[in-house]
Amino acid sequence: MKLSSYPHLVKEWHPTKNGELTPKQLTSQFMLRHISLGMLLSFICCLLATSQSHSEDLGLLSLSMRARVSEQTVLGKDAPEDFEEYDVAANFGLPWQSYSASGWGTGTRLMASAGILRGAGEDALVVSLVPELTLGSEDGRFTLDLGVGGALFSRSRFGVQDYGGPFQFVLTLGVSAPLYKKLGLGYRFLHYSDASVNGPHTIGADFHMIEFNYRF
């Protein structure tokens, strides 16, 4: 893909000719790093405070491995670059839940993930924390989940595509069902975006992923 196809990206959001970031980009990255760090620290503090009174409700629910299988755009603009993502995730139960005697209801959990994002010949480490609301069986065999959280990228520019900065908002929707005993199979939709914090020309991406999980 040629840079000339996206002149606005080259003009406003790419480094200068000597490879240095513009003052606007430096300021944005500085602010986003501190904002993302503050958000993560605040969320961790909330979890620690909660665990003191609800420690019996917290625990590892499942581990999963995921890989992107489709690049169909659902939200936002089409990504000019093609991406692959592979990651592992751990789901921790949170104390807020309500299940009926039949074993069906709603719950909450925290999804923590780490993986590799690959595009335009470049690789990036991606870590995320996403609180989720779940609907399904209490044993986790059948689950529908929806979550909004944050992710940190070790790099935010891939070829002509600029995600905007190291911090990205994450929107996720997933569904899983039992495959064999404690093993499960699921589908996950992930959307990364900086919500135009860094300007109107940044572009996020959608990820349709297959997910294998193991329930504890």
Residue ranges of each PLM-predicted region?
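Outer-membrane beta-barrel "beta-signal"
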Residues: 86-88, 204-216
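Residue-level signature of outer-membrane beta-barrel architecture
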Residues: 90-94, 133-137, 177, 214-216
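Cleavable N-terminal export/targeting peptides
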Residues: 1-58
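Short loop/turn motifs that connect adjacent beta-strands in outer-membrane beta-barrel proteins
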Residues: 52-61, 94-106, 121, 138-143, ...
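Outer-membrane beta-barrel pore domains and translocons
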Residues: 66-72, 111-117, 149-151, 190-192, ...
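Transmembrane beta-strands of outer-membrane beta-barrel proteins
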Residues: 59-67, 104-112, 127, 142-148, ...
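Extracellular loop and loop/strand-boundary signature of outer-membrane beta-barrel proteins
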Residues: 74-77, 117-119, 157-161, 195-199
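Short sequence motifs at beta-strands and strand-loop junctions characteristic
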Residues: 80-82, 123-125, 165-168, 202-204
